[in-house]
Amino acid sequence: MKQVKITAIRKVQHDDLIAQYENPIEHACDIEEGQTWMSENGQCPEGLCPEAWKTMREFVEALAHGEGNFYDGWMRNPNSAMISCNDGFRPVSFYIETIADELQTDRLLLRRWKESDAEVLYKYASDPDVGPRAGWPAHQSIEESREVIRNVFSSDTVWAVVLKETGEPIGCMGYFTHETSNISIGVNDCEIGYWIGKPYWNQGICTEALRLMLDYCLNEKHFEHIWSDYFTGNPASGRVMEKCGFRDTDKLNRCSHLLGGDKDMVRVMLYEG
């Protein structure tokens, strides 16, 4: 059974209250734009307004059981839906989508990061040959690695790349939607980013993890185009992308907020199918 993420997209302000109750304010919930809840096993998440749950329940249960076949105005995606309901007195739009906690191959497991991973993250992320190639500075302490796990890797679009043989995270893999991407991409597109610890370079691990993430993004999330980029000084990353089906767009990109952002990056793209 799949986890389902529920996101409040917007609250439409109306002057007239919806007259469902004698005193609708007593039944209302405080719902803010961007607020999220996670539904486990198709159950109503704690803190979600009962009035909203009544409307979305059948959609959430269907998605949780892998029975969803919904099409909304934003994404051509059978694993998501956008619905409108109310929090007791005002209409609210919600986006509901399935979330994968784990993905795996014969030798790799992609799972959520844990704070207990901080020490091993630091072991690989403190290497000056790793971070700068991906646009971020080498970690300076275990505490810094712990903060990254809390504030960056806590996203539900980021996974630790774990070698099953050792049970140890050896890298990171994730995707960005059009709202969080470093580059300008379409609403139905995503951007993929990744890195692998230096001791595991040239073993096919990065290619294996990227193919797994591409399968998820194309066949579960149903993105139309998948984008990525790499520094011209890091051609090995480009070869990994080429093996996985990416093609060069003949465009160079610069991201000033990244470490080394003043250097050229090659932009690549993968079409669905």
Where are these regions (language model features)?
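A generic structural motif
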Residues: 43, 137, 174-176
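Short, compact, well-ordered microdomains
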Residues: 59-99
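Short, Lys/Arg- and Gly-enriched loop/turn segments at beta-strand edges
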Residues: 44-54
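A short helix-loop-beta-strand connector motif used in the catalytic cores of GNAT acetyltransferases and
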Residues: 149-160
